[in-house]
C-alpha cells in the first residue's frame, strides 16, 4: 500500500463540495466494468470510505484545538489504504478514483491526487469536477494554457456551475500578461473575457458574496472599465451585505470608484462616513490619492 505520512490539509476557498460526497451517491450507477455483485460491493465500500473520510475531517478540526491529531492521522492513513484496495479491486471504477483523488488533494498530496484524477479522466472524460481539478493542478504548476483548456472543458460540461467560470476568470487575470505575450489574447480581448467570466459566476450565484465581490473588483483590473456599471455593482453590494463592517468596505470601494470617475468631492464625502478601524489604512491611501490628484 502506498503511504502518505505527512497529512497537510489544504482547505481551499470556494471549492465545490467534496467529490467524495457526490460521487459516493452516484457510485451505484457508475460503470465499474465489474459484475453486478462486485459493482454493488464497490459502491458499498466507496460509500463507507466517504463517510469515514467526512467524519475524520470533522474530528481533525476538533483535534487541532487539543493538538491531538495522531489518532486522526492514523484513521486517514487507514482510509488511504482502503482507497488503494478499492481501486486495485475495481480498476475501472471512476467514482473511486475521483473520490480518492479529491481526498489526496484535500490532505495536501498534490501529485498523487493529480495522478488519480488523470486516471479518472481516462476512464470517463465527462466529469466537470475532474477537469476543474486538473486545471487547478496545471495552474499551480504555471502551465496556464493547459489550465485554461481544462477549465474550459469543465465549463462546457457544466455551464451552470459558477465555480468554473470563476476559476477561469482568476486564471486569465493571474496570467494576463503571459496570455498577451503568447498572443493567445489581445489586451482588450482578455479584459473582456476576465469580466465576462466573473460576471457569469456572479449571475449564476447571486447570493454568494465572494463571486459578486470579485466581479465588482474586476472593474479595477481592466484597462477600460465602465465606471457607471462598477458604481451600480458597488451600490448593490452595499445593500446586499448585512454587517456594518462589510457595508463600510463596500462604501470604500464606492468611494474609489467615484474617484476613478473624477468625482473627488463625492468620494471624499463617502470616506468621511467610514470609521471602521480595519479600513483606516486603505482609507488613508485613497485619501492621499485623491489629494494628490485634486489638491485643495
What are the roles of these predicted feature ranges?
Residues 96, 130, 164, 211, ...:
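TPR alpha-solenoid repeat register
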Residues 22-84, 88-89:
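N-terminal leader/linker segments that initiate helical-solenoid repeat arrays
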Residues 72-81, 106-119, 140-153, 176-200, ...:
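Structural signature of tandem alpha-helical TPR/SEL1-like repeats
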Residues 93, 102, 127, 136, 161, 170, 177, 208, ...:
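Residue-level recognition of tetratricopeptide repeat
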Residues 86, 119-120, 153-154, 200-201, ...:
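Canonical positions in the second alpha-helix
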Residues 89, 123, 157, 204, ...:
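Structural marker of alpha-solenoid helical repeat scaffolds
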Amino acid at each position: 500500500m502506498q503511504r502518505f505520512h505527512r497529512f497537510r490539509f489544504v482547505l481551499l476557498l470556494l471549492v465545490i463540495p467534496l467529490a467524495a460526497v457526490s460521487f459516493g451517491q452516484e457510485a451505484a450507477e457508475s460503470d465499474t466494468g465489474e459484475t453486478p455483485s462486485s459493482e454493488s460491493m464497490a459502491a458499498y465500500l466507496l460509500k463507507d470510505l466517504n463517510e469515514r473520510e467526512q467524519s475524520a475531517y470533522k474530528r481533525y478540526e476538533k483535534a487541532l484545538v487539543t493538538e491531538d491529531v495522531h489518532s486522526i492521522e492514523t484513521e486517514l492513513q487507514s482510509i488511504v489504504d482502503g482507497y488503494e484496495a478499492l481501486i486495485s479491486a475495481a480498476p475501472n471504477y471512476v467514482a473511486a478514483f475521483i473520490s480518492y483523488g479529491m481526498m489526496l488533494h484535500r490532505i495536501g498530496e498534490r501529485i498523487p491526487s493529480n495522478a488519480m484524477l488523470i486516471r479518472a479522466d481516462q476512464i470517463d472524460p465527462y466529469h466537470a469536477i475532474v477537469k476543474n481539478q486538473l486545471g487547478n493542478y496545471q495552474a499551480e504548476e504555471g502551465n496556464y494554457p493547459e489550465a485554461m483548456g481544462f477549465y474550459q472543458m469543465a465549463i462546457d460540461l457544466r455551464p451552470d456551475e459558477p465555480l468554473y467560470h470563476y476559476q477561469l476568470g482568476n486564471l486569465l487575470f493571474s496570467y494576463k500578461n503571459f496570455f498577451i505575450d503568447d498572443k493567445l489574447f489581445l489586451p482588450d480581448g482578455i479584459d473582456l473575457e476576465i469580466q465576462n467570466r466573473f460576471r457569469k459566476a456572479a449571475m449564476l450565484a447571486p447570493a454568494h458574496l465572494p463571486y459578486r465581490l470579485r466581479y465588482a473588483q474586476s472593474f479595477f483590473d481592466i484597462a477600460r472599465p465602465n465606471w457607471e456599471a462598477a458604481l451600480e455593482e458597488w451600490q448593490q453590494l452595499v445593500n446586499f451585505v448585512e454587517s456594518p463592517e462589510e457595508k463600510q468596505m463596500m462604501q470604500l470601494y464606492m468611494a474609489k470608484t467615484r474617484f476613478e470617475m473624477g468625482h473627488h468631492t463625492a468620494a471624499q464625502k463617502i470616506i468621511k462616513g467610514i470609521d471602521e478601524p480595519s479600513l483606516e489604512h486603505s482609507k488613508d491611501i485613497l485619501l492621499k490619492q485623491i489629494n494628490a490628484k485634486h489638491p485643495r
